Amino acid sequence: MMDHEITPELDAFIAASLDHWTSFGPTDNGFSIAASAIMNQMIPGRDARAWSELNKAWGLPNLGKATFYWESDHCPVNESPFGLAAALQYTLLRSDTGNIDVFPQRVEALRNASFALMRAEGGFVVSAVLKELRTQWVEIESLLGNECLLRVRDWTDVAVAPSVVVEKRG
């Protein structure tokens, strides 16, 4: 994977490319919706757009229960539901950047949210509560005894030692 320095110009270029790609009209392709939602989540300031993209999927007539999804009339696939689940998880918890980002997306629809025992890369189990768009608390358990950098949008970054509960009220 190439690791380019992210600049405002690069973000703008990526956003313009993504907007062009999604401008071709509605689609019933769930994987395109999942990919668009995840890509929008990676661009600063596009929280609402990412949530809007993700919500397009829930009304698809070809999205069934569990992992049933049909790209066409007779072709069941399972990638799209898993992609949509990943996009939803990215809204709550991201750990693919080398940090653990808790509630990286802030959208009005998730004004009050919580999750318990979600897995993060590096052998971490994370639980957290968001109330009125403010992070109330985060609990991290390191299954391997590792340390991590916790990033919470409305807190200053916190270095976390194994088995520590981080709480900030205010």
Language model segments and positions:
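Active-site core of glycosidic bond-cleaving carbohydrate-active enzymes
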Residues: M1-D101, A113, Q136
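Beta-rich accessory regions
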Residues: E5-D28, I43-R49, E108-G170
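Acidic-and-aromatic substrate-binding clefts and catalytic sites of carbohydrate-active enzymes
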Residues: C75, R106-E108
